Amino acid sequence: MGESIKVGLTYATPFWREKSSGTIFSNVGPIPEMYDHSNAEETYFGLMGFLNGAYHSVSKEKRLEMILKQLTKYYGKQATDYLSYEETVWHHEELTSTPYASHVLPHQNNGNLVFQKTYANGRFILAGTETSPVYSGYMEGAIRSARSTADKLKELFKQ
């Protein structure tokens, strides 16, 4: 986590849904991934995502400018009409950032079979995006892991 920056923008409406999705996966621009982060009651609308940690040395204002430029490419001018912008630069947080001796590969151990097994006669189950063999490290991986874990629990409680 220490190598990323978490960002969030709030809006008056979920205009991105008109363009099909609030989900972004990109290899171009500062935002590699972003999600619709609106509440279930549909009273709060936001986009939440991550920036590459290399942007930690760029000013908050410049990061926001780059984010809005990328969002405008996806969603149009409405992306610049945000209500609030928040960010956490994990690199600056003492308890979540550790200097690395070398380049950190993304999601290097995620999806390993050891994370998909149950332990203690099926009573100890690991769950989370890191355990998913598909899309591990991403929201889709978390959803798949949750479904897999639910299936394991159903099977466990049948007995």
Please report, for each region that a protein language model flagged, where it lies by residue.
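Central helical "cap/lid" subdomain
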Residues: 1-19
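Conserved flavin/dinucleotide-binding core of flavoenzymes
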Residues: 19-159
